[in-house]
């Protein structure tokens, strides 16, 4: 029985795998323990992960629950490490496989020199001797180790010996020509190999002796492996034969693959799994899905279609994801009448079902692009391409959910069978019924299924191991010998719930009136009445007292816990609490000290760092991921709670919603009922508040985090889609026609790239229509300015002359310039001027446009390994230019080029948070977009085989993938690197029918180029999007459009129609579609119209045309390298110049010069020029714009920001007072802080302010709607206080006192030092309050320190220590006397108390509840009334003794104080703790003096039930990190 069939799996992390999932190599099976011809049954558990969670939960629950028991050790468990797949593979390799490996390992020459010929199995001895001789020769060249490896690999074809010493005696005859013939006698499973598969495999892998047995073992392989034999036939010397059988040597032989790193095998697609994917006739992406595509019947497809409609297109998210989900919404359901919604919805469900039918029905196996292009009628314009991918992705989720449901169903069914048929009485307590199994089938989400499994694990988890043992024994009784290896883990012995079950506490829980399931069913309506017990709760509990539960309070607490636990695991209860929590949860945020220093104006959370009472439903897009990341980095503290501040103030907690409905309360008012109602309320309170709320907090947190991550992935996908959505530059047809014969009809693109390092040379490159490099240009001084000083202008002109000659010689159709920084705009103008000069001189036929282009992709390519491998001699900037030119030609091949084994595509910057999300999900979404665009454009398969930079496009073709594309290219290279027609994909490349159907329509054959290379017939339709399945319809349309006889040549008709496509307009395609429908082809109207469109223009580019970045897009590209500029942020800028407003000549007459007290006249415009008479000022104004004339009125300053952008600061934003001349406030070439007031990206305009009021002011209008102003003000006040305190500390006089205990530190620093010092140490430091005083600090226990003031007097100097030190009315001469007489006595008494065995170390005496719990624990542990010491936090040097003073279990708390003279207790003095305790033990029953005022006690036992707690207010919110 298969391992998976024997065990239902729940955990994703389960190690169990089915043999059906992946073929095992033969060597893998040989490496395992040999199997006898006996059936082996392996029981495993998928509950390991869940059990570990329960185990951890159990440990937490057991802390402080009941009396201690002896700890029981768990059995040591060890897991066998997985064997390396690399060492298990024994594949046949053809020459190209070996070449690929050697290329990766950089040993091409070595392999060629040491090539070994592998001998074939034969009856003749010559191949055997040759193979052995080759091995010996190889060993002599490489050494014995390599020789052994090569013989191990070739042993299948030769004699199979490892060395000469291993040969049998039968091998002594070598040269008589009658060598023994060896036959293997073994079980074979060839019936499982499809007919013709071996032939296909030989063609694909390029080897003649391909053997499936070397890749995959059949089902009987393991059973027959032990008995594998060799049969040796020899001549008996008398004309007869002797057959000798012997066990075949199964010693593991080292192969070539075993010497290769696994990563290299993966990169080369050389593993057994890769080979299987290549051979199997199914789309590669179907096989690579985490949950592979499986077969489904019609009923299953209907259920799945309804499920996808509900959860993919109708289900709402917890947070607001409307913006990122817009692309996936169903456009057909938008803006329609409510009366039509239901019909439209049903139509969409049918369309989804049709799509699933194409995907999951094995006879179809169609990928999304094929469905979108060639099955349009089935989706009837109801689903877009994005919708189709959503259906595909949700199909994977549905299959995953179905598999988990199946496994849990099987597990529960087996448990039910165990309950019914076994003799285990404990298993029958809670029988599994049919409804429990039905609930699994009705589960629609992973959350619901997890709830069911959690409940199952609680109730039956402890029985799993017993169940598997029973199943083993049952199989053994049926005659099946089993090998048993249990992987179930029973519930741990110290699990709190399980201990209650084992001690029979569940019977008391059953007397509470309702079971957990009945309680859950009562949530909607009162389906079950409460069965009231006649006994009082504590009286009922007395019946179940046992050694583990020693009193009735403990018994009752255990029963309450059991029922609460069961309630918390009920799926209906969880579902209700989950929905309440998701609908009403709020969160609070505040920055930590690190966050306040780190989060500045440019941080995404700057205006969201103080949040109060924000509902999680108000979170948008990826907002929560920013919070999560900031929390991980220690920048913020965050709280997630159900109740808002208003709810807490009104006492409206989550549990109260469940208690207010009186679901678990009896409507009677007797004392018995009231006590039981109180117990029931406590149960519900425990289930909701203590168990479900923490669980739901974590679940909701993870849910909204996943939604935020998915938002990032979708935004990355959208950004990526926008980058590949446009085509390359296509020159106008006139430009192509007017060229000479040498350059005609060929697109040529040029790109120039410069480095941000100005000393480096710039490079230009020309590529042809295939992206191949034609020529390149090196310009050393391209980035210099033409009007610079010295010889800069001449050097610039030298580079520009080289550019002109290059353009004149190569005649590019367009020129691209990389956007590196702000300099690109100037360099573009230089290029445009040079091109215009060439055109004006008639050196080129037409104007050549210069385009600025984003160079991010080009820079990624420049740094990639694949770029270095393709262009090893080119400098980095030239490699960047090559990529930029190819992008200008067509961006898609260049993006696909980076989708390689190095994953260079993920170096693109698509979103600031893209590194913080699951890269597998990101890769899946980006892959969808590339698949869409590649198939929309079509793939020229011959170009992929000829040019390496086009090769990667093939893997995105519908039906293919990286492995199948690699195999296909290998076949093409074996066919002279040319595919003349699509049909050759089947005939020559051996594509299976399903893969061919998927990819055929998207593979383009450039019929013009192919016709030039071959004399074979070339099908013109192979160069179109018309699918081969509809070629006959296309020919029929061509013949009908030309109105010729049906016997006419359809190929000629097609050629004529393509030259005159307007003749197709007269065709009645609707009638043609109706005729096809009548003939049984189905609805094909959309297909016919697509064929007509394709005949009019083959493979018309459906992408948007190329455009140069401009406006906001160009602004973002130019500013991406520097600090992000946002409105409200503060930036450093340098004043470059003063901006003047020109003098309007019409206004000169109205301008009146200002007259000063010095009898001078000032120009009213510039406010700078002065003259002795008004006429001179007028002449100054009239000469405006000329040398010496008026420059105009100053209106502001030009500022250069850190990111290279130029901004403007008007006069009104320079200062709060009026400014005529900005230079009176600022200086040129000096840096100042500015605040960004406004940004206009279209005009490249940034408005600044340097007014002090603007720099100090935040931007409250931009803050979050739930901004916590109070917390913000408190933090600002605290920061100011801390700053003031630090200033005061810095100004405090440093004392110079020569004593080992003296330190110039603060109180906080002193406490930290004491934590690292011995218990007997103390620290003397300067007093923070008085100059003539000291402070002494010493440690009592953790977090409690005693600090007191020492007055100094009779000081000689201000800095010296006083000759008299006074504390509490006592005088001391020096510090040593102070420490010896005053400090050390208190430290010693304190140490005696804090190291006592009954000292409470978990808290302080103020923590009364914790102290009392500790007293009870000590009583159970010791069996008598104990006493406990605790220290006071609020009053250092004061301690408390807590003890039970009578049989009523009441606890009394008495305080005592220590001093240098001893201990003061009950108004008496004791010189040691021992003397105090001796007196206390004799008088503890006596009431202490002043009991009413100075003593406190609290009852802990009563005759009635524990105090009623229908709900508990949670503790005040505490920020956690």
UniProtKB/Swiss-Prot annotation:
Q: Which residues fall in a compositionally biased region of kind Acidic residues?
A: 45-56, 67-76, 90-103, 167-177
Question: What are the S1 motif domain coordinates in residue numbering?
Answer: 1182-1251
Supply the Gene3D superfamilies for this chain.
Answer: Nucleic acid-binding proteins, RuvA domain 2-like, SH2 domain, Spt6, Death-like domain, Spt6, helix-hairpin-helix domain, Tex N-terminal region-like, YqgF/RNase H-like domain
**A single GO BP:** transcription elongation by RNA polymerase II
- What does the record give under GO molecular function? DNA binding; histone binding; nucleosome binding
Task: State where the protein is found.
Answer: Nucleus
Report the superkingdom from the record. Answer: Eukaryota
Q: Which SUPFAM superfamilies match?
A: Nucleic acid-binding proteins, Ribonuclease H-like, RuvA domain 2-like, SH2 domain, Tex N-terminal region-like
Any Pfam family: HTH_44
InterPro entries, per database record = HHH_9, NA-bd_OB-fold, RNaseH-like_sf, RuvA_2-like, S1_domain, SH2, SH2_dom_sf, Spt6_acidic_N_dom
Which controlled-vocabulary keywords does the entry list?
A: Nucleus, Transcription
Per the record, which residues fall in region Disordered? 1-204, 1490-1521
Q: Where is the composition biased (Basic residues)?
A: 26-41
Q: Which GO terms describe its cellular component?
A: transcription elongation factor complex
Please list the residue ranges that the record marks as compositionally biased, kind Basic and acidic residues. Answer: 77-89, 127-149
Give residue spans, biased composition: Pro residues.
1504-1513
Position of motif Nuclear localization signal? 26-42
Name all SH2 domain ranges: 1299-1388
Job description of the protein = Histone H3-H4 chaperone that plays a role in maintenance of chromatin structure during RNA polymerase II transcription elongation. May be required for several aspects of morphogenesis of C.briggsae, including regulation of division in the germline and gut and specification of ventral-uterine precursor cell fate.
Family, according to the entry, reads as follows:
Belongs to the SPT6 family.
Assembly and interaction partners: Interacts with glp-1 and lin-12.
Question: What PANTHER family has UniProt attached to this entry?
Answer: TRANSCRIPTION ELONGATION FACTOR SPT6 (PTHR10145:SF6)
- Stated name of the protein: Suppressor of Ty 6 homolog
Give the species this sequence originates from: Caenorhabditis briggsae
What gene, per UniProt, encodes this protein? emb-5
């Amino acid at each position: 029985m298969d391992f998976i069939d024997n065990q239902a799996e729940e955990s994703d992390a389960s190690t169990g795998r089915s043999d059906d999932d992946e073929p095992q190599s033969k060597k893998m099976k040989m490496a395992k323990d040999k199997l006898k011809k006996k059936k082996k049954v392996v029981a495993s558990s998928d509950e390991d992960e869940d059990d570990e969670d329960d185990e951890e939960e159990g440990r937490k629950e057991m802390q402080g629950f009941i009396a201690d028991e002896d700890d029981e050790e768990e059995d040591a468990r060890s897991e066998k490490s997985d064997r390396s797949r690399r060492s298990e593979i024994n594949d046949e390799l053809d020459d190209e496989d070996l070449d690929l490996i050697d290329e990766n390992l950089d040993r091409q020459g070595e392999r060629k020199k040491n090539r070994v010929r592998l001998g074939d199995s034969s009856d003749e001895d010559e191949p055997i001797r040759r193979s052995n001789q080759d091995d010996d020769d190889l060993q002599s060249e490489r050494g014995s180790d390599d020789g052994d490896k090569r013989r191990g690999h070739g042993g299948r074809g030769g004699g199979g010996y490892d060395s000469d010493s291993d040969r049998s005696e039968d091998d002594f005859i070598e040269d008589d020509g009658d060598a023994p013939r060896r036959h293997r006698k073994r079980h074979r499973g060839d019936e499982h190999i499809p007919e013709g598969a071996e032939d296909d495999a030989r063609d694909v892998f390029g080897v003649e002796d391909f053997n499936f047995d070397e890749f995959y073992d059949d089902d009987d392989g393991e059973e027959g492996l032990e008995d594998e034999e060799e049969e040796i036939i020899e001549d008996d010397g008398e004309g007869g034969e002797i057959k000798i059988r012997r066990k075949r040597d199964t010693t593991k032989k080292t192969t070539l693959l075993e010497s290769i790193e696994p990563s290299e095998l993966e990169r080369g697609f050389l593993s057994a799994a890769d080979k299987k994917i290549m051979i199997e006739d199914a789309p590669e992406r179907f096989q690579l899905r985490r949950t592979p595509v499986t077969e489904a019947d019609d009923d299953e497809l209907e259920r799945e279609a309804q499920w996808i409609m509900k959860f993919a297109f109708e289900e709402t998210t917890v947070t607001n994801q409307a913006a990122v989900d817009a692309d996936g919404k169903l456009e057909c359901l938008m803006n329609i009448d409510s009366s039509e919604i239901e019909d439209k919805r049903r139509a969409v469900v049918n369309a989804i079902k049709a799509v699933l039918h194409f995907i999951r029905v094995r006879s179809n196996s169609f990928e999304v692009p094929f469905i979108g292009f060639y099955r349009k009628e089935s989706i009837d314009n109801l689903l877009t391409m994005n919708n189709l991918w959503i259906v595909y992705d949700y199909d994977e989720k549905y299959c995953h959910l179905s598999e988990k449901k199946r496994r849990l169903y099987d597990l529960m069914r087996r448990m039910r069978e165990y309950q019914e048929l076994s003799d285990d009485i404990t298993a029958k307590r809670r029988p599994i019924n049919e409804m429990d199994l039905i609930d699994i089938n009705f589960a629609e989400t992973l959350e619901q299924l997890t709830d069911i499994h959690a409940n199952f694990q609680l109730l039956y988890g402890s029985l799993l191991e017993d169940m598997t043992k029973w199943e083993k024994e049952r199989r053994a009784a049926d005659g099946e010998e089993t090998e048993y290896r249990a992987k179930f883990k029973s519930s741990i012995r110290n699990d709190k719930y399980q201990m209650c079950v084992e001690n029979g506490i569940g019977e008391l829980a059953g007397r509470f009136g309702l079971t957990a399931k009945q309680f859950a069913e009562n949530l909607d309506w009162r389906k079950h009445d409460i069965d009231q017990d006649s006994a009082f709760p504590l009286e009922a509990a007395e019946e179940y007292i046992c050694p583990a539960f020693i009193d009735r309070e403990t018994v009752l607490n255990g029963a309450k816990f059991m029922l609460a636990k069961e309630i918390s695991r009920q799926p209906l209860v969880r579902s209700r609490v989950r929905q309440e929590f998701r609908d009403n949860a709020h969160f609070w945020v505040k920055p930590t000290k690190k966050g306040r220093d780190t989060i500045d104006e440019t941080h995404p959370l700057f205006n969201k760092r103080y949040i109060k009472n924000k509902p999680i439903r108000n979170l948008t897009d990826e907002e929560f991921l920013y919070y999560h990341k900031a929390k991980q980095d220690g920048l913020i503290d965050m709280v997630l709670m159900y109740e808002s501040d208003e709810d807490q103030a009104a006492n409206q907690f989550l549990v109260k919603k469940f208690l207010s409905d009186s679901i678990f309360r009896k409507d009677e008012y007797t004392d018995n009922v009231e006590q039981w109602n109180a117990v029931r309320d406590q149960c519900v309170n425990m289930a909701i508040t203590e168990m479900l709320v923490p669980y739901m907090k974590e679940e909701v947190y993870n849910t909204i985090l996943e939604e935020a991550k998915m938002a990032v992935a979708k935004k990355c996908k959208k950004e990526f889609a926008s980058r590949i959505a446009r085509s390359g530059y296509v020159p106008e047809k006139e430009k192509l026609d007017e060229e000479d014969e040498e350059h005609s009809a060929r697109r040529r693109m040029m790109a120039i790239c410069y480095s941000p390092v100005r000393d480096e040379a710039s490079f230009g490159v020309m590529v042809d229509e295939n992206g191949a490099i034609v020529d390149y240009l090196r310009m050393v001084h391209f980035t210099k300015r033409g009007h610079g000083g010295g010889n800069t202008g001449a050097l610039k002109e030298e580079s520009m002359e080289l550019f002109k000659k290059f353009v004149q010689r190569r005649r590019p159709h367009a020129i691209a310039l990389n956007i590196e920084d702000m300099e690109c705009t100037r360099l573009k103008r230089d290029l445009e001027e040079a091109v215009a000069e060439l055109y004006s001189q008639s050196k080129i036929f037409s104007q050549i446009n210069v385009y600025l282009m984003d160079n991010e992709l080009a820079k990624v390519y420049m740094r990639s390994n694949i770029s270095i491998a393709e262009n090893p001699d080119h400098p980095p900037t030239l490699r960047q230019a090559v990529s930029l030119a190819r992008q200008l030609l067509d961006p898609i091949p260049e993006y696909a080029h980076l989708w390689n084994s190095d994953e260079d595509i993920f170096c693109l910057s698509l979103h600031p948070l893209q590194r913080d999300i699951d890269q597998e999900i990101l890769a899946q979404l980006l892959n969808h977009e590339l698949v869409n665009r590649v198939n929309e454009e079509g793939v020229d398969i011959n170009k992929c085989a000829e040019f390496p930079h086009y090769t990667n496009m093939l893997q995105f073709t519908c039906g293919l993938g990286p492995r199948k594309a690699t195999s296909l290219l290998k076949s093409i290279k074996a066919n002279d690197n040319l595919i003349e027609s699509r049909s050759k994909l089947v005939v020559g490349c051996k594509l299976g029918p399903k893969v061919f159907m998927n990819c055929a329509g998207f593979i383009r054959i450039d019929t013009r180029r192919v016709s030039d290379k071959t004399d074979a017939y070339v099908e013109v339709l192979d160069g179109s999007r018309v699918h081969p399945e509809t070629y006959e319809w296309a020919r029929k349309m061509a013949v009908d459009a030309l109105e010729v006889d049906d016997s006419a040549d359809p190929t000629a008709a097609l050629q004529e129609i393509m030259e005159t496509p307007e003749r197709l307009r007269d065709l009645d395609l609707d009638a043609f579609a109706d005729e096809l429908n009548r003939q049984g082809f189905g609805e094909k109207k959309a297909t016919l119209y697509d064929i007509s469109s394709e005949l009019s223009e083959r493979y018309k580019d459906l992408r948007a045309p190329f455009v140069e970045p401009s406006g906001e897009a160009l602004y973002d590209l130019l500013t991406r390298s520097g600090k992000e500029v946002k409105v409200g942020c503060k930036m450093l800028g340098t004043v470059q110049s003063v901006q003047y407003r020109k003098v309007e000549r019409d206004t000169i007459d109205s301008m009146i010069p200002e007259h000063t007290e010095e009898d001078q006249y000032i120009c009213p415009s510039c406010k700078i020029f002065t003259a002795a008479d008004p006429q001179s000022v007028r002449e100054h104004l009239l000469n405006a714009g000329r040398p010496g004339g008026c420059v105009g009125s100053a209106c502001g300053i030009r500022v250069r920001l850190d990111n290279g952008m130029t901004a403007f600061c008007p006069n009104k934003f320079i200062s709060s007072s009026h400014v005529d001349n900005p230079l009176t406030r600022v200086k040129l070439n000096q840096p100042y802080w500015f605040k960004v007031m406004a940004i206009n990206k279209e005009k490249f305009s940034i408005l600044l302010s340097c007014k002090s009021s603007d720099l100090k002011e935040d931007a409250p209008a931009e803050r979050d709607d739930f901004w916590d102003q109070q917390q913000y003000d408190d933090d600002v006040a605290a920061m100011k206080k801390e700053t003031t305190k630090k200033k005061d500390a810095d100004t405090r006089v440093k004392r110079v006192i020569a004593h080992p205990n003296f330190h110039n530190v603060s109180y906080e620093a002193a406490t930290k030092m004491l934590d690292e010092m011995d218990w007997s140490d103390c620290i003397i430091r300067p007093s923070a309050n008085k100059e003539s005083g000291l402070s002494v600090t010493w440690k009592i226990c953790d977090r409690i320190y005693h600090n007191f003031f020492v007055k100094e007097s009779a000081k000689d100097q201000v800095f010296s220590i006083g000759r008299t030190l006074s504390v509490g009315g006592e005088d001391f001469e020096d510090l040593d006397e102070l420490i010896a007489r005053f400090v050390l006595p208190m430290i010693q008494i304190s140490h005696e108390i804090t190291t006592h065995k009954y000292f409470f170390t978990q808290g302080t005496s103020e923590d009364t509840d914790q102290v009392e719990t500790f007293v009870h624990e000590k009583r159970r542990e010791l069996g008598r009334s104990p006493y406990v010491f605790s220290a006071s936090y609020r009053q250092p040097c004061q301690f408390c003794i807590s003890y039970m003073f009578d049989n009523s279990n009441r606890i009394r708390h008495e305080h005592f104080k220590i001093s240098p003279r001893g201990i003061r207790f009950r108004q008496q003095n004791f010189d040691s703790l021992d003397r105090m305790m001796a007196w206390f033990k004799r008088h503890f029953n006596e009431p202490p003096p002043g009991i009413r005022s100075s003593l406190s006690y609290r009852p802990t036992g009563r005759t009635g039930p524990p105090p009623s707690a229908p709900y508990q207010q949670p503790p005040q919110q505490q920020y956690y990190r």
